[in-house]
């Protein structure tokens, strides 16, 4: 069964009790704010360096430091590569294109760059809405379409001035990102969607965290068809959260079951880095020398000494 969710103030009180129980004598939760590398959207990019662009939703960029994309740059040698987080909260693979955000990002992409594409959390929404611009994409990866009304007119982007939109499938939108990126001489890379703090009992009688919210197979099918790497950060993150357990993991999701704290965002960024290494991605050549991750100093996590940002030698959770 799913673990119950509570109001934020109640969750905060519970977290204080959990931390105090795990670390006797510690006055409440002391999860530290990790090293920040928030990069303004309008930060000039060094034209002589390749750039790693991040295209996604609030799980990659949310407020000041709650998205993993804002904890990504310090893992890299930024004298050799630019990191550009272009994720926008609330977007889906469809709405990021429709509102013109993809065109703005694409205008900055040059030959030799990389584009990390991570969409899905908002693609399951309602395709048509009378109150706002729809976000949901069609199910599947095919070329089937549907003509739907544009409830709230666009003033910019590909739907500017139009009253009817052609709705495509999730896979179609991914293929558009891929084709557009390649047309600029850059390399597209798909990322599996971040995991949510939703737990259910498995056949082994133990609680397991949700690893797929319905888009994983689509990503892999598109990746295989288009010969694009799929970086499985979701499995790396899920392994870490299951190692921590439901109670400690809940400390990292104080808002809801989708959005993390700054510490959780740091862990997700570390999971992306680990997944890139595991896949022998060309992005690994730009990584800075490994250092202990900021979240390791959190008392609630010190009871789990093998929770690491980077895969280490040996067996066990260090491989996460």
Stretches found by the model and what they are:
Residues 1-5:
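Positively charged n-region of N-terminal signal peptides that target proteins for export
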Residues 6-17:
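Bacterial N-terminal signal peptides
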Residues 21-33, 42-44, 48-54, 65, ...:
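Low-complexity, Gly/Pro
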Residues 23-89, 103-115, 131-141:
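Serine-esterase "nucleophile elbow" of acetyl-processing enzymes
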Residues 23-35, 48, 246-320:
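Conserved catalytic region of serine esterases and O-acyltransferases that act on ester linkages
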Residues 88-93, 198:
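Acidic helix-start/capping segments at beta-turn-to-alpha-helix junctions
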Residues 92-101:
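Structural motif
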Residues 101-262, 266, 271-288:
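Alpha-helical cap/lid subdomain in secreted, periplasmic
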